[in-house]
Amino acid sequence: MPLQPPPDHTWAVRIIALGLAVTALIFTSTRDTSRHVGDPSHSLPFGGHYRDGSKVIHYNSPRSSKPSNHTPYLLFAPIGIILLIHALHRLGNSAHICRCTHCMPHSQT
């Protein structure tokens, strides 16, 4: 029986890590953490006005007091971070030595 190297599980680990990252992203982006306003029969989670006999509820939405929306910036943040890391790696490593065959100068004989 010949000796065989153990199986390489790097692709399985990468797929599992990617799945966990996507799951965490979806969980955190779809979670509603706004405070509960109103009673069980009259809930106003996104703001509004309700009047019923002696009960009056007027609640402004959390976003109405702060109209700034940072969603477009959050979409481009990962790309910006990747580009920043790449630029810092290129600028900080001035003594870059490439040992691959296509980077080495060909000797002309």
Curated annotation (Swiss-Prot):
Topological domains, Cytoplasmic: 1-9, 93-109
Annotated transmembrane regions: 10-30, 72-92
Intrachain disulfide bonds: none
Localization annotation: Host endoplasmic reticulum membrane
Lumenal face of the membrane: 31-71
Domain of life of the source: Viruses
One Gene Ontology term, aspect cellular component: host cell endoplasmic reticulum membrane
Keywords noted in UniProt: Host endoplasmic reticulum, Host membrane, Membrane, Transmembrane, Transmembrane helix
Family membership noted in the UniProt record: Belongs to the Tymovirales TGBp2 protein family.
Full protein name: Movement protein TGB2
Phylogenetic lineage: Viruses, Riboviria, Orthornavirae, Kitrinoviricota, Alsuviricetes
